[in-house]
């Protein structure tokens, strides 16, 4: 089994654990596109809050990890609910980003693709 297969298998296992967690609590009834998108946004805001009024290296690593995990969990729930293939989505988006941000224009630059 290669590394990518292991990652896919591990992601499937994690997805099943998340689904089991949700099912045991009967929370799937609340998981629609609007509420999942809002939950993702709120968790992203909580991640931002870890850095509010602090320098980038002053955030609590444990709190940052918790918020990042929440974002990933909601992303996995969203993808599973709507039968999105996360691997396919990520690779497709990376391909789009490669076209938007060609190395010769984007390397070392923080500009948005519309500014090239």
Give the location of each predicted region.
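Flexible "arm" and connector segments at domain edges
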Residues: 2-68, 72-116
